[in-house]
A protein has these predicted regions:
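Short beta-turn/strand-loop junction motif enriched in small, turn-promoting residues
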Residues: 48, 90-94, 135-136
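Short beta-strand segments
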Residues: 38-71, 79, 87-89, 99-101
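Short secondary-structure boundary/capping segments
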Residues: 32-33, 57, 77, 93, ...
Length: 172
């Protein structure tokens, strides 16, 4: 797993290595493809009563994770009070196929709250990506209950355990 924490290292220092280091860390292209291909993220916030974990749809634009959340939700209240978040996107059932990406940082609200669809150039790309990923089209439909959150990760950790088990050649 690679620990890419810009907030805790000098600009000229390479990312610190965790267990197994580069052996199972996804490269940027693999990570981007993985995030684009998965559908559900697990979003962890902190409420006054403790951790709060919820599934949420998202899109990744290559630099930021975009989340659309109901503005009357516990998650929204948590993030309004404390914008720190951890997001996990993972896949795999068996140990040898586990892979995932954890993104940590602070979210920021982007656009109107709640979103009704007023033109907003900074939301053009995430809404196009979201409509294509979840609605099979180019147009995002707004229900007046959701709004956008953008997470530009301060730390990204990725792993792909399939790298530990290279495909064995079969002989006939």
């Amino acid at each position: 797993m690679t620990d890419e924490s810009a907030a805790t290292r000098e600009p000229d220092q390479p990312p610190r290595q965790q267990r197994r280091g580069r052996k199972i860390a996804m490269g940027p292209a693999e990570r981007d493809a993985f995030l684009a291909g998965q559908r559900t993220a697990r979003v962890a916030t902190a409420s006054e009563l403790g951790p709060h974990l919820t599934p949420l749809w998202y899109v990744w634009d290559g630099t930021a994770l975009w989340l659309t959340s109901i503005v009357s939700s516990q998650r929204w209240a948590d993030l309004a009070r404390d914008p720190r978040v951890a997001v996990l996107v993972d896949a795999g059932e068996d140990y040898a196929e586990l892979r995932g990406v954890e993104l940590r940082g602070r979210v920021e609200i982007v656009g109107e709250v709640p979103r009704t669809g007023l033109p907003d150039p900074q939301l053009d790309e995430p809404e196009r990506l979201f409509a294509g990923k979840y609605a099979g089209g180019d147009v995002m439909h707004h229900d007046g209950r959701h709004a956008w959150l953008r997470l530009v990760p301060e730390k990204i950790t990725s792993w792909d355990f399939r790298m530990l088990f290279p495909a064995q050649k079969t002989t006939s």
